[in-house]
């Protein structure tokens, strides 16, 4: 599987292509929530933990919102919009100092999770989702490295 992190220049905003909705058909909402749950649990033990809520209830709520967003972006029920309004993810992430290296860690934590799907999800669907994460995450970078 080809899950390589794309390096970008600060301020670069490549065009984003939504992931293929068939991924949600293979995983279902529960399966997608499990991917996000696994990712957030990996974040707990990572160097970017400080960027996420420290309060357990708030951390769980952030996890739920992330899963809601991905379900919606994959053509599922618009949970995110119903509860939070329009996604506007760049604006929602603006209060946080997101550097290229923080993005890299965030993506690296997804790699083993996505690789673990190979036995039940067609590889092209996983790679399309990865490409979405890879490009979409560049839009969240708002701080240069120190």
Predicted regions and their residues:
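Core of compact, soluble alpha-helical bundle domains
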Residues: 1-146
């Amino acid at each position: 599987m080809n899950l390589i992190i794309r390096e970008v220049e600060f301020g670069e905003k490549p065009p984003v292509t939504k992931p293929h909705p068939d991924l949600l058909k293979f995983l279902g909402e529960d399966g997608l929530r499990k991917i996000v749950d696994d990712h957030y649990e990996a974040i707990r033990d990572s160097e970017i933990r400080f960027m996420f809520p420290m309060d357990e209830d708030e951390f769980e709520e952030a996890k739920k919102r992330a899963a809601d967003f991905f379900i919606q972006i994959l053509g599922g029920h618009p949970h995110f919009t119903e509860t939070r309004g329009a996604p506007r993810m760049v604006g929602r992430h603006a209060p946080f100092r997101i550097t290229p290296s923080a993005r890299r860690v965030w993506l690296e934590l997804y790699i083993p999770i996505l690789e673990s799907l190979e036995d039940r999800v067609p590889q092209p669907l996983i790679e399309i989702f990865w490409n979405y994460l890879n490009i979409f995450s560049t839009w969240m970078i708002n701080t240069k490295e120190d």
